[in-house]
């Protein structure tokens, strides 16, 4: 399979990506976005897809020509004001407008049934959250955590610690749902996507890129290089300290923060010094130089309040915005935004791939790829560890699990991973134009805890 760059964009996808780009290129919901959504709403009315004439209506009727699908916006007002309004800082009526806007602006990417299920997820989340939003989310039936993440991460609310932990809990649900499905849950198509994403990112990174563009995508590149090898949780990666790299005896070492909390309680974090410990890993020189290059490029920029590896100025500069006064660290929301931009601007437009965000096929064609989620690399790293010969106990320790049984869920798809990798090696042997690889694990690492 030839790895193709299409810098003019993929014409066959342009009509599909129009609305999706519009929702992504606006960092947060605002009045302009709602107005745009209302324009699209009326366009869908003219096309006969939305049968309700009024955007403000309590209930929308839509049709896909096979069946009528209704959207009932009866969000529990009392529960929203009690739990979610203090968290989001968004009034009830405005929240409903944002929810309607998100659905309209997502209609070119998702079928109506999927969006109806998403709306029901939001209603269940609001209605069934009792006391602790971070714990309750695990007990609430969520069918479309991916869409929930996209929606909540677009809300113009202050990025509190609880908000980011809430998004991570939803990300965890994606992995949990994979494990609850039959054994074929991660089919070859998903592993094909990992290999294809690796190829695209590698090829893109080797291009001559403007510093501003490279800096915007730098966190994504290091996320893939590090967390696809070391099974980190997203927040562990994002809280990597600025002074994380050192050299000793001609070898390079990277210090990472690991969560000291276990099970469902891991989402309840109050003080980094108490909830995280430092662990050091030996890393290849190439990765060390890549991290050092980022440190050099951002040397003169304002550090975050938590003095993390990643600064935020280069992120918000993309939209000509200044970093807020509460510049704690580059958040899960920020990284998720970068990932979505990469899939839209690079994977789809530059390389001409068709991206499946939901309901992917069992096997992909050469120009197709599934969307990858932030939490996926933890799964990849666990499989990679076992595939490279590490013991289940080692995988358990590196993942921060209490027992091997928990870890085994992550590498239960090893056979499919090996099958896919064998398939890609075969493709490599039969065509020298493309190589597939997932970075090999480093054999040397330190498990010892050094509390911060």
Q: What are the language-model segments listed below?
A:
Residues 1-185, 225:
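Charge-rich, intrinsically disordered N-terminal extensions
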Residues 177-226, 230-452:
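Extended accessory and catalytic-adjacent subdomains in large enzymes
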